[in-house]
Amino acid sequence: MRLGRYVAAEALVLASALAGATWATRASLRFFSERGRATAGQAHNRGGADPEVSVALLPRGELSRPPNPAIIEEPAGTFLGMSDEMLLQRVRTQAILGMKLNKGGSTLSFRVELADGSRAAFKPAQTDLRTIPRKEVAAYRLNRLLGLDAVPPAAPRMVSREEIFSHLHPDSLAALPRIRAETVFNPTGRTAGVVMYWVPGIKDSDLDTPEGIHQSMQWLTQGQPIPVDKRSLAAQLSQLVVFDFLTSNPDRYSGGNMKTSADGSRLLFMDNTMSFFIEPEGNEKTRSILHRTQRFSRQLYEALDRVTEPVLEQVLAQASLGEYQILTPSEIRAVVARRDLVRRYIDGLVASYGPRNVLVFP
């Protein structure tokens, strides 16, 4: 039932972003507003809170906001030692010379050859709502706001039907009927997709297997030792736990979504297109992982203060592209509500075990 509401809402947002139609925008706003009123009573019954009523449940002190809140500038971003802005400029503006459909995925994604010889990944707007391109942009921007460098730089990019079809790799021509059927184009023949830096040589890991999860949770449990050679990885896993709870990403542990850099030293927070659900309490999977985690990064904990509605609105607006809406107001409110929950959870651990035992990573 919850997934059905999400898919219906996403379809309205997609219609608004692609067509820019007034009726679509108004319909989307009506949907979220009516959903909030209709489910306010249900929230009490299920023990959770609805996005539209969750703000009223927060302590008054956490709602206070200065009359003119200061605009927080995003930390200067880097990714694998390279400037984010340089990588973003490249994937946003370089001409497309080739597109090859990535095999094995249940949704559409392409490897793109750019004019300067670099590569990018491209995910178009599509009928399969398990891939929502704008969510990848939101995940990257949230990652950057938190001072992380784990999500590959991602930006919205409008790509025309002609760019895709005329540059399609010969190996992908057999998939042309599927590409035509599943790619959503607006009336001008363009698709509102996301383009991302192509990370060379990424590797799969076993961190999302039952054994891998059990082992990593041991490193993040009070009283358990962290092997010296695993301390950096443990710190990154702790960051991932918080990040996935904030984005409400249930897909991380579904298999194949725990990637590392070529040398295995860096954990990459990739595949975020099925995230940012509007339930403020998050989903069962990410909530369960969070509540098993008892060691965190001090810098990330402090960076949670930046995650407010005004700042998120500003950051996402700067990354937007015309009518391309990155997150809806309900999705932004849900992120902030989850921020409050994770901060309270960590505060509770600090009260029980002390800051030196909880905020153990830089």
Where do the PLM segments sit?
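Phosphate/dinucleotide-binding and metal-coordinating scaffold of catalytic cores
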Residues: 5-362
